[in-house]
């Protein structure tokens, strides 16, 4: 048995999940350090495997859902609906955690706070609170102990990437570099002060634009005095994930198609500005991070994973787009 499985019960747990779902390729790879040929399970099975594996792999699947250059459309569709099936941390535990990591006692800053999670994700869960001045805020709280889980799973993920790197698939997509890039981004997500800074930069960059109406886009305001590495406080926004939201065309004379087209155009231009103008972009734009608000605006959330493009790369992208638009393969 390879040393990949010799060090922790977590590694054995992962092997059990692969066996339960019949992914024989990964069983061979993890047990013997090699396998006959690369093999990816059907889309729905892969989604269930990633869900069962837990937070790190859910995040990986969500990221892969934005990479049609790596996976075919049926996999992109399946992974786009990927959510972590993780129960919320019990209220008593989360209250203790918040008291430990909040700069001040909750009763000094909140008129009220709901210790029952409004939403629970792979890395953190969100709570609603009311400040003493009456403003509603979202309190994003890191799951207790998640840093240790991430460290362990990231180490294993890198080892798996090394094993896969010898295959044609691994060489084509440089899976070792992809795993390292993903690992660094995920580790950065565990520091909410970084996410606060990234959110503020995106909010500033997107507050002015010649490409779209900034009034139609919201990046939440951060409340710095209440933000730490483990807790992120931001303005509360009422809405739903964009694929689950009831877009009814209420500002378009009831024309649902017209509003959907306008929303699509807005999101398209928002990201084009990030890529081609700012060179600073939200790097985890899966549908769960785009909200359709009750006032019909679009919100860009969870800005903990970002990317940067230098001027040279931006100019190459512009040339590529111009070549596509003009059907000029020689450009």
Question: Which role fits each region the language model picked out?
Answer:
Residues 143-146, 304-305:
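A generic structural motif
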């Amino acid at each position: 048995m390879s040393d990949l499985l010799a060090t922790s019960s977590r590694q054995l747990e992962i092997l059990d999940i692969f066996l339960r779902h019949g992914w024989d390729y990964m069983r061979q790879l993890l047990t013997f350090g090699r396998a006959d040929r690369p093999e990816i399970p059907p889309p729905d099975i892969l989604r269930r495997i990633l869900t069962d594996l837990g937070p790190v792999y859910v995040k990986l699947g969500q990221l892969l859902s934005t990479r049609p250059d790596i996976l075919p459309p049926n996999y992109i569709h399946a992974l786009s609906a990927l959510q972590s099936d993780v129960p919320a941390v019990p209220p008593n535990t989360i209250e203790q955690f918040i008291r430990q990591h909040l700069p001040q006692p909750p009763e000094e800053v909140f008129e009220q706070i709901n210790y029952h999670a409004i939403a629970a994700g792979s890395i953190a869960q969100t709570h609603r609170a009311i400040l003493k001045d009456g403003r509603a805020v979202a309190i994003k709280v890191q799951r207790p102990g998640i840093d240790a889980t991430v460290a362990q799973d990231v180490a294993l993920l890198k080892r798996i990437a090394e094993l896969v790197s010898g295959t044609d698939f691994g060489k084509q997509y440089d899976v070792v570099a992809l795993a390292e890039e993903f690992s660094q981004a995920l580790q950065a997500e565990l520091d909410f002060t970084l996410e606060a800074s990234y959110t503020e930069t995106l909010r500033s960059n997107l507050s002015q634009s010649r490409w779209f109406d900034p009034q139609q886009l919201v990046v939440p305001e951060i409340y710095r005095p209440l933000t730490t590495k483990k807790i992120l406080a931001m303005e509360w926004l009422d809405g739903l994930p964009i694929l689950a939201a009831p877009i009814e065309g209420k500002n378009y004379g009831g024309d649902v198609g017209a509003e959907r087209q306008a929303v699509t155009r807005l999101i398209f231009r928002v990201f084009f500005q990030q890529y081609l103008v700012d060179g600073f972009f939200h790097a985890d734009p899966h549908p769960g991070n785009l909200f359709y608000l009750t006032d019909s605006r679009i919100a860009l959330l969870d800005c903990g994973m970002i990317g940067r493009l230098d001027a040279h790369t931006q100019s190459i992208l512009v040339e590529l787009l111009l070549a596509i638009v003009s059907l000029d393969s020689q450009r």
